[in-house]
From Swiss-Prot:
It is a single-pass type II membrane protein. Its EC number is 2.4.1.-. The gene is MNT4. This is Probable alpha-1,3-mannosyltransferase MNT4. It holds the Pfam family Mannosyl_trans3. Keywords: Glycoprotein, Glycosyltransferase, Membrane, Signal-anchor, Transferase, Transmembrane, Transmembrane helix. It comes from Saccharomyces cerevisiae (strain ATCC 204508 / S288c). The chain crosses the membrane at residues 11-29. Signal peptide: none annotated. GO terms for molecular function: alpha-1,3-mannosyltransferase activity. It comes from the Eukaryota.
Length: 580
């Protein structure tokens, strides 16, 4: 035994030296520097010693690999070496990409000669590899443009849709006048969108058709007057489009006005090799970026509004910042890892040239943000390590004010740090923050809406549901995420067979299915006090059910709906649950 311990002691230095040698060899092979203090191009650009186009030429000529914003594949299985080197590599990669995008944007505003725009066009193919620039620059460039299809079957390619500023009715089209003397994104913003246009946009593929039909029915009930545009990548069948048109235009009731429905196919704008990378959540970027409206309201298919959407444009926060975001459920136990927080801090520090770790640096950040809700988001990220902050089921975004944040968000969504957050959500506001742009969140916390469970005492209440709700300052429902059935997922077989506590409550799979597919009952809302009684996850609906709790005078806020509110909400619930 003593001899074995001695052998291990002798081998330990050898093992350590071997591992260290492997790390050194790996870094040499990958051309990583040994002294890595995360200097970025942004610092060089700010020095004023080099004109931005000279810097772009230098990067384009000598550092082409650093210029390309390729899409990264998530790597769930990481070797020891990649674990050791990853954080530094991720900071350098993302900081470099952000710096290159910033440099491109600055140069876009300083074009002085033909060679400048030629260089920018060359750089664009590397910074935005998902755009089909080959088609745009070919003799058949007309085929690059997305195809608009109106509900009546009329198709337009290479046209700008025009809507009345008085009643949002369709009044015609005008040709897109793309100028070779302008950068791509500036061209798109100035020539492919009607100035000050507003509308509803959704990203829809086949599996979202049923929920989208339900959403359109609700929009009709709300007397929606905004045009609706459904964005897809040629992955929405003609038969499905006809079902959506019927939902938007059928004359079953004079009280429900027909909708100005459009379809936008953006497939030809995208490089084939990147087409499949835009799936699920990431399709939102295509919808918001390429939709026909300057100021779109983006909706998830399972979002349900309870107020006319055009009234949201009147919210003070949106009018002040050009954005309106809503908060997600707050989970104290769902945290970013210390390494993830460190990486994000370093990227923020590099991008904004300020230390978010120091008290003075954070005070500078707060002063620059100048918005309590935005400051709260940053504090939640940096100090509370909060992984979930934004619910992106409804987003309002003024592209005239903040357009270039969209390509930045796309880069972040597909960067090496894409796994830090769930889907698209946090990249909306982080792209604005890193770009030093204004943004805000609606000031009311996210809530749980549904049926009040029988209280243990008269002073306590609980609501358990799959719906995430958002209320105004008076307690009225603005909108919710998650549809209006008890559980929108077809998971009754799984829950019944895998969850003993669920099987004990229901006699059969059919009984559980009937319950899951039944309409919700909207009786009240509880806004939890997460510091005292946080959201709790339940086993129903494959763990998509959450409970919030209220105890009078101690924690939470209970809002019980009036009879008139309940009657109105029941009407929305009934309409949403009609057979599709």
């Amino acid at each position: 035994m003593v001899l074995r311990i001695r052998r291990i002691k002798k081998l330990a230095p050898l093992i350590f030296t071997s591992l260290l040698s492997l790390i050194v060899l790996f870094r040499v092979y990958r051309q990583y520097p040994f002294s890595d203090h995360f200097e970025t191009r942004r610092e060089d650009d700010r020095s004023g010693n080099v004109h931005c186009f000279s810097r772009l030429r230098q990067i384009e000529e000598y550092e082409k690999p650093e210029l390309t914003s390729k899409f990264y594949e998530p790597n769930r299985w990481k070797s020891f070496i990649s674990y050791v080197t990853r954080s530094r590599k991720d900071v350098k990669t993302v900081s470099r990409s952000l710096s290159n995008l910033d440099l491109y944007q600055k140069c876009s505003k300083e074009i002085r000669a033909d060679q400048d725009i030629s260089l920018l066009h060359s750089i664009e193919t590397k910074l935005f590899p998902y755009i089909n620039f080959t088609a745009l620059n070919s003799e058949q460039s007309h085929n690059f443009w997305p195809v608009h299809t109106r509900f009546d079957g009329t198709k337009y390619r290479g046209q700008v849709l025009q809507f009345s500023s008085e009643n949002n009715s369709f009044i015609g089209t005008s040709p897109i006048e793309f100028k070779a003397s302008e950068p791509f994104w500036e061209n798109w913003l100035n020539s492919a969108l009607q100035r000050n246009s507003k509308g509803v946009v959704m990203s829809v593929s086949e599996y979202l058709v049923a929920d989208t039909i339900r959403l359109i029915r609700v929009l009709r009930l709300l007397n929606n007057s905004l045009p609706i545009e459904i964005v897809h990548k040629s992955d929405l069948h003609e038969s499905s489009q006809q079902l959506l048109i019927a939902a938007a235009r059928e004359s079953g009731s004079l009280n429900y006005p027909p909708q100005e429905l459009w379809f936008l196919d953006v497939k030809d704008m995208l490089n084939d090799e990147y087409l499949a990378r835009f799936k699920r959540f990431s399709n939102k970027w295509l919808a918001i970026t390429f939709c026909s409206f300057q100021i779109p309201i983006f909706l998830d298919s399972d979002t349900v509004p309870f107020v006319p959407l055009d009234t949201l444009y009147e919210i003070d926060g949106f009018k002040r910042t050009g954005t309106l975001f809503f908060k997600d459920r707050s989970f104290p136990t769902s945290k970013l890892s210390p390494l993830q927080v460190k990486v994000l801090k370093q990227i923020i520090n590099n991008s904004l040239d300020v230390s978010s770790d120091s008290e003075q640096g954070f005070e500078i950040l707060k002063h620059n943000l100048n918005d309590e809700m935005a400051i709260d988001a940053i504090e939640a990220l940096i100090f509370k390590k909060q992984k979930h902050y934004m619910d992106s089921g409804l987003v309002i975004f003024d592209k005239q004010k903040h357009f270039f944040c969209l390509p930045i968000a796309i880069m972040l969504q597909f960067s090496p740090i894409q796994e830090f957050f769930h889907g698209d959500k946090e990249w909306f506001w982080l792209s604005l923050f890193i770009s030093k742009k204004e943004f805000t969140f609606y000031p009311i916390e996210a809530s749980n809406v549904g049926r009040l469970e029988k209280p243990e005492t008269l002073e306590s209440s609980t609501i358990c549901s799959t719906q995430l709700s958002h209320t105004d300052v008076y307690g009225n429902l603005l909108w919710l995420n998650g549809g209006l059935s008890v559980c929108k997922k077809n998971c009754w077989n799984y829950d019944f067979t895998k969850r003993k506590e669920i099987a004990a409550k229901y006699k059969s799979v059919d009984e559980l299915r009937n319950y899951y597919q039944s309409p919700v009952k909207l009786e009240a809302v509880i806004i939890p006090d997460v510091s005292k009684s946080p959201w709790s996850q339940q086993s129903e609906c494959v763990m998509y059910s959450y409970c919030t709790h209220y105890r009078k005078g101690q924690y939470g806020k209970l809002i019980e709906f009036t009879d008139s509110q309940k009657k109105y909400y029941e009407k929305v619930v009934e309409l949403w649950n009609k057979v599709v």
